[in-house]
């Protein structure tokens, strides 16, 4: 060995030393890897588990967002359908009111006698025994238009007057049953469709406590009651024709409360006011945490999305971490609480809007039905009075040939 090492040149000895050091370093690295064993593998497994958890988290977020998007779209379609129905009913209501207020009444072709005309007693044998003989002079004196001609205008003029200037006459008890039924029908409702909408007059009377939105505000535990909201106004109505022979009883007809067309202003006042919940105190860490900006909650944001977005700010905040509030900071707890309050107010506003629209649709449908009934009744009454005028004209022409 010594002979071989001595016989070798310096360059060959240097190459042998380098190769030996390389072999020693490779063997030492292999032994170190073998001695460590499983720690790199366990670290790799933990990384994979965290990635899987994050994938589950994002999958859950994606499904939640898809469900929220579908819910918003469905609610938007329902709102559009409800608004379209309200617009159609409002247009029909206005058309019926205009038709009821401007009903074309043909003028009679016969000439009316003077109001001071006194019909004398006529003998029974003056006229032949025919259809005219059934018309007695005593029966003609009971016609209400002849008795009240010097005090009130004719019925044709009454139909053209404003409802505030109509004085309802009290006719005799011998009136025909058709007029009695028509008058009783008109006196059964305390709200007349003749009255137009007057904000100056209706502002003097306040709406009763049966308002839909007021009920929602009182019944909802999520909204405060210290906000001064404008109350809708109710306009008093009066029947066009009172019941014949006796005044209309006050206890029999039930007052029909009609909705005043102040919906957009009420809803804007309802939704624009900030209504903090009275059951939860104000935030104690608003100024400390710097989160004193007002919560931006809109009706388009769904409840599940608002709660899920507040409950998950990053993938590291899993559901297990959120269930334990003891390890969270006061800023996080306060932010969660205020977000939940905003979601409650949003739900209360949405529920109030939905119930208001439903109630308005019901009121418009009922009012339109009443207007149709009144129009048909007025047409029948006009036809009846035209026949009465024709009979009176025939009698007058027979008495004065």
From Swiss-Prot:
Residues covered by region (Basic motif 1): 60-85
A GO CC term assigned to this protein in UniProt: nucleus
Name this polypeptide is given: Transcription factor atf-2
Stretch list, region Leucine-zipper 1: 89-96
Start and end residues of each stretch annotated as Leucine-zipper 2: 364-378
Taxonomy, superkingdom: Eukaryota
Subcellular localization, as worded in the UniProt entry: Nucleus
A GO biological-process term: circadian rhythm
Basic and acidic residues bias (residue ranges): 41-78
Family in the record: Belongs to the bZIP family.
Compositionally biased spans, kind Polar residues: 222-256, 273-283
UniProt xrefs under InterPro entries: bZIP, bZIP_sf, NFIL3-like, NFIL3-like_bZIP
Assigned keywords, A-Z: Coiled coil, DNA-binding, Nucleus, Phosphoprotein, Transcription, Transcription regulation
Coiled coil, from the record: 361-388
Record function comment: Acts as a transcription factor that recognizes and binds to the sequence 5'-[GA]TTA[CT]GTAA[CT]-3', a sequence present in many promoters. Involved in the development of the excretory duct cell, by positively modulating embryonic transcription of putative transcription factor lin-48, acting in concert with cell death specification protein ces-2. Negatively modulates expression of key autophagy-related genes, bec-1/ATG6 and lgg-1/ATG8, and may link together autophagy and apoptosis during development.
Domain spans labelled bZIP: 54-100, 329-392
């Amino acid at each position: 060995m010594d002979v071989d090492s001595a016989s070798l040149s310096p360059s060959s000895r240097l190459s042998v030393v380098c190769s030996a050091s390389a072999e020693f370093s490779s063997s030492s690295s292999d032994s170190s890897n073998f001695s460590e064993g499983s720690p790199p593998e366990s670290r790799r497994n933990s990384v994979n588990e965290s990635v899987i958890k994050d994938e589950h988290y994002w999958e859950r977020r994606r499904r939640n967002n898809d469900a929220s998007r579908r819910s918003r779209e469905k609610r938007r379609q329902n709102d559009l359908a409800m608004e379209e129905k309200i617009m159609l009913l409002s247009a029909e209501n206005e058309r019926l009111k205009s038709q009821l207020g401007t009903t074309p009444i043909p003028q009679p072709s016969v000439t009316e006698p003077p109001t001071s005309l006194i019909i004398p007693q006529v003998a029974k044998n003056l006229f032949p025994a025919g259809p005219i003989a059934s018309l007695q002079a005593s029966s003609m004196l009971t016609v209400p238009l002849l008795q009240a001609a010097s005090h009130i205008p004719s019925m044709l003029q009454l139909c053209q007057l404003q409802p505030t200037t109509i004085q309802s006459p009290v006719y005799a008890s011998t009136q025909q049953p058709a007029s009695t039924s028509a008058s009783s029908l008109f006196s059964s409702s305390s709200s007349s469709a003749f009255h137009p909408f007057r904000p100056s007059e209706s502002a003097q009377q306040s709406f009763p406590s049966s308002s839909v939105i007021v009920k929602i505000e009182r019944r909802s535990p999520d909204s405060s009651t210290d906000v001064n909201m404008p109350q809708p106004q109710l306009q008093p109505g009066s029947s066009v024709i009172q019941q014949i022979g006796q005044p209309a009883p006050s206890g029999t007809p039930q007052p029909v409360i009609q909705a005043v067309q102040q919906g957009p202003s009420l809803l804007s006042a309802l939704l624009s006011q900030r209504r903090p919940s009275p059951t939860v105190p104000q935030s104690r860490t608003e100024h400390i945490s710097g989160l004193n900006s007002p919560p931006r909650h809109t009706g388009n944001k769904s409840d599940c999305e608002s709660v899920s977005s507040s409950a998950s700010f990053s993938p590291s905040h899993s559901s297990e971490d959120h269930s334990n509030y003891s390890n969270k900071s006061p800023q996080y707890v306060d932010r969660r609480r205020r977000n939940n309050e905003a979601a409650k107010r949003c739900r209360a506003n949405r529920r109030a809007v939905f119930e208001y629209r439903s109630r308005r649709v019901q009121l418009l449908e009922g009012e339109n039905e009443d207007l149709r009934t009144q129009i048909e009744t007025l047409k029948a009454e006009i036809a009846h009075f035209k026949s009465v005028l024709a009979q009176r004209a025939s009698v007058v022409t027979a008495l004065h040939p």
